[in-house]
Amino acid sequence: MNREALCHDDPIGHDRLRPDSIPRDPKWTDEQWQAITARNSDILVAAAAGAGKTAVLVERLIGIIKEGVDVDRLLVVTFTNAAAAEMRERIRTALTKELARHPHQTWLRQQLVLLNRATITTLHSFCLDLVRKYYYRLDLDPAFRVADETEIALLRQDVLDEVFERFYERAGAKEGTESKGEYFTALVDAYGGDRDDSPLQDIVLQLYEKALSQPWPEQWLQDILGKFQEAGDTIAEQTLPGELPAWEALPWFAALREEMSIDLAEVESLLVRALSLCRQPGGPAAYGDAVTADLQLTQDLHLAAGRSWTQLHECFQALSFTRVKAVRGPVDESLKKEVSRLRYQAKKKLTDLQKKYFLRTPHDLVSDLTQVLPLMATLVDVVLAFDRAFQAAKREKRLVDFNDLEHFCLRLLLDESASPGVPVPSSLALELKEHFAEVLTDEYQDTNTVQETILTLLSRNNRFMVGDVKQSIYRFRLAEPNLFLEKYRSFSPYDTPGPVNSDHGAPDHAFSGQGASVPGARIDLAKNFRSRRNVLSAVNDLFRRIMTPRAGEMAYDRQAELVYGAAFPELPGRSGDPVIELWLLQRQPDADGSEESIETQQNANETKGAIDGDHKNIAKAGESPAQNTADVAGESPSDDAGEDAGQPTGGEEELLLLETAQYEARLAARRIEELMKSAMPVYDREQGGYRPVCYRDIVILMRSTKGRADIFLEEFRAAAIPAYADTGAGYFEATEVSILLSLLRVIDNPCQDIPLAAVLRSPIFRFTGEDLARIRLAEPRKTFFDAIEAFIGQAEAAARDTFTPIDPVAIRLREFLRQIDAWRTLARRDSLAKLIATIYRETGFYDYAGAMPGGGQRQANLRALYDRARQYEATTLRGLFRFLRFIERLQDQGGDLGTARTLGEKEDVVRIMSIHKSKGLEFPVVFVAGLGSQFNLQDLRRDLLIHKNLGLGPVVVDTQLRYRYPTVAKLAIQRRLHRETLAEEMRILYVALTRAKEKLILLGTVREVAKSAQQWLHDAEGIPVAAALPDEVLLRAKCYLDWIGPALVGHPDGQEIRRWAEGAPALGATLPENNLTMTKNETMTEQERIDGSSRWRLFYAAKKELIGLRKETGSETPFNPVWLEKLRRLEPIIPTDLVDASLSWSYPYTGLSGIAAKVAVSRIKKQFVWHSPETPPSSETPPSLEIPPSLETPPSLETQTPSPDALVDLRPRFLQQDRRLTATERGSAVHLFLQHLDLAGEISQAGIAGQADRLVKLELLSLEQRQALNEEEILRFLESPLGHRLRKAKQVMREVPFTLALPAAEIYPEKRAEGESVIIQGVIDCLFEEDDGWLLLDYKTDRCPVGMDRERWLQQLRDSYLGQVNLYHRAVESVLKVKVKGRCLFLLSIGREMAL
């Protein structure tokens, strides 16, 4: 370009070039050039992965600057500071090159100067600059600072605790019967959890954060509350004939009808398949009529779902099924069985929908919303109160957080006349709007609503937005991908730009060729310049099948597909691109086939619990669909299979997940070895040619690195593969950090035994375990610090008495105390950072850490601790004590700082990272692991859900009868969030697969390959190869393999799935070596490349085939003379193989991890019965115990409906409305009275009353307990034959505590616990001695339920307490060594003795 005419000394007056007159640079594609040169309107660039969007954005900026726009008149918003710095540097480089060609152009020099103050930054940084400049308009202290995330999190929790405390105080004051305080009490009871109110606090914070993502947070809160008020209004409205009820307009019913359409479409597909089988030769034609009737019924339901909830409810109320006719004549049994299975699934789905959504009338559903309205109003009040208190606390400390920056900026840009939905710009906004010639936004798909409002106020149809909605994976940070989608749908495709106006602002006319007004233009950058053709074809083949508008929030159509644009030169001897590998790891089933898959176990535990877990303890039958509710994702054979096996405990499930990660890591390690051994060629653009693959070319991606990355590191270490994982955790567990924190705790307070012992044993002071034992013996009863002083005193006295040298340990201890005292003085006088620096210098610990294995990382961690101390003291807090409390609170809340990063880009190691952290990066070889791990749907299990559009979704909770069930609002929000979560997971998978440049290897685990393959075949049956899978199949997915498997069924290379489904190859067969080495068909052919179809190779491996893959590390290392030289150079000399052997050691007692060391009788009493209940045991042989099969699984709380009288109010006493004791508390009062009863006193009702009053005066009984005593029942007991025996006994022992050790195998027979013991603790009500032995007595206050047969109740009581008395019997004879001649219960409520 000729810059002589353009870049002269007076840039203001020169003629500007029109974009359409700029000649096209051949290095850019047509679409890229359009994105670079288009002007005069809002422009949305949908840039696919690897499309070079950053280069396009920089080139556009350079072009605008060349047109005469000063660089400081451009607002460029990036997602990260690193992206902003990179963009600024690229612009500087381009301007510098231009200046080199035109050295006399002062205008170019001016742009380089202006670049330093150009607004190329993150949105938060822009907001911060604006707030700093106009702080006085916001009534902010000019010395404010942006709080650290950890600091603000701790302050937020403090403020929230204070707000809750104020609401508790208001509740305790009882200001009126309908006060907000009482509603707060009900709110805590309903949503506060069983142990504390932290679940409710989480809800408050979640709602608060959700509100802050809206431009008008308070108005948004009032709007979502208004939906519940509107529901109440609709109940009273009269409906005219032919009109729909007013409540039909409530958003939750419309949302649920949309979800019903998806469910009914699945039922239709099942029945259509069944009907086609009926009509096949040999099919059960007699079933055809019933299946046809079912299909017609389903279609009618589908039509009703599109009309109104009223019609849909009526149709479901009339739901009935036609009986099938008997099959006569010859028939294919396999077809008959398949038709029966399909029809059963369809009927079950319909009946499940009926039970979950339609057992209760619409009026009842709306009434539920009015019932929870006061609680939702109180919740909003709490959120608003927290907001006010939080803002006040931040102002007091002169702090702002990132949310404040956005909303303060918004306040500056909004005029006082602005109102919700009407963002009127302020004078400042108008000024900035005129100043900025263009507003450019990178990663636009990750923008939220507040940020969108800010950018809109700063622009005048001069926005340029770049992003890829398929890579929007930050919904958890409240990003709103729909902002991108709405513009993409409303903007017209770019055609021909109109003339440029003089302000580089609003367009003279629109982009349309007809001149019609459109809101903006869109440009698709579909060409991918990163990956090989086969990688792109594989991504297209997969997402064309799974990304649909309903399941993925957009269609993966021609505009969304990736187009090959990279230039990979041909390599001699190589025929084409590497194939995509999909590895299925087979977890070997048990011999009886009862082992359950990880996926299915998690299905039942998480997903089904998430959707069905709201229906708990319905008070009356039919009031709410409490049972047999369906999973939102539908039914599947794997779901059914999962019901046959017992579910594992949480600990067992975690072990299964870790085991799966271990074998996937082992396979990945072997595959990496093969790639390195074969010297797989990769193209290096910097070198301009091919080179052998290096470790740094390889990345392992996983959905979450927590708990998995460490396992991969361990396996890679065992295989001698260098690897690095940035897990963002593990900092506090690092040895060097733990030692320094212990030392700081000792400096703060030396009377802390554990930190003190840790410091003494540390490399800083190097005391041995024997030294510590001797110190403790000097003073066994006091603190360890006292023991040190006592040891020194005793050693000095002994030296004086015996005229011998002082014990060397005492000398070292005296020096230790002197050093600690000096540091304590320094801590009081100087900064915390200086204290830490002094410790590093005086102890040499920093240098010592550098000489340890991994010394660079350790020193980086120590530097991070020093930096953290400096940052801490930059806050409003000071001092060592507060810093340590800060660290402790951070750890208590599960926080971590993450190990310091020391890895450089060029270091030759395999990277292990989460998919989120990989966004924006690229690697020649990408492994995606954990594809069989289930999606995390735990949030759907919350008692109260929140949605940006549908508002609040609570459950109805009756704290007296102890049941809960979801409102229609929660049902709707639950389904909507489920869909949005799966859409996000689909985009995360897209990001993972598009990181690969040359080779993609996928790893996933299934229980049995054959069963998984059969399910995938069912899911894809009848679907054309080029068509998307049904939404109901996609929404049923529990893991990524549930999408990948069905999508590959119709692929030419997916035939392997059919072979697996048929049982070939045989499961458990030895894994062929060439399956690992990939010696055949490594690349796709030229014809396949031309056709555009992707090439895959599918493998499976059973667990037993992977066990032998790990290399064993030797245990001995001969002496090496080089060590002496390393010692002279102060380098570490520890043999790495010995370190590896130690670090790879596996804990041998994993099987005992779920066994309690101590357990109360009340926790296990129902598990124990005699082998022969009718034969009482002899005193010589204590009774043996077993767990009855019916009690192996504890009864679910959801199946029990305790009587209100049996429930304990979990609220604090001062919050309880009714101070009457519960049945449990009354029983405790009776036991307490009988424990202190004087058996020699007067036995009459008056005498019992007198003794009870005496115990009240002695404060052994409370007044409430005294009033709960039934004196007649107690008198009846004392006057009974058993009571007479008790009063005449030779010796009486009451409330006898005991501790008994039992073999763990008796308590946990399912564990491998040979040789282990469990401590059993309990209290025996009464033991009394007679002439011929001891009698064991247990008195009970149970009462027979109304309407229940007494004999049946007595039998239930006997069965219930038999195990408890058995344990008491065994304890007495084992501990007291006395003979128990008999055992009995006394039922106080009926005055009856029961021998056991």
Swiss-Prot record:
Its cofactor is Mg(2+). It holds the Pfam family UvrD-helicase. ATP binds at residues 47-54. One of its GO terms (cellular component) is cytosol. Coiled coil: none annotated. Its EC number is 3.1.-.-, 5.6.2.4. It catalyses: Couples ATP hydrolysis with the unwinding of duplex DNA by translocating in the 3'-5' direction; ATP + H2O = ADP + phosphate + H(+). Residues 615-920 form the UvrD-like helicase C-terminal domain. GO terms for biological process: double-strand break repair via homologous recombination. Residues 26-532 form the UvrD-like helicase ATP-binding domain. Residues 1-25, 590-649, 1171-1205 are annotated as: Disordered. The heterodimer acts as both an ATP-dependent DNA helicase and an ATP-dependent, dual-direction single-stranded exonuclease. Recognizes the chi site generating a DNA molecule suitable for the initiation of homologous recombination. The AddA nuclease domain is required for chi fragment generation; this subunit has the helicase and 3' -> 5' nuclease activities. Heterodimer of AddA and AddB/RexB. Belongs to the helicase family. AddA subfamily. This is ATP-dependent helicase/nuclease subunit A.
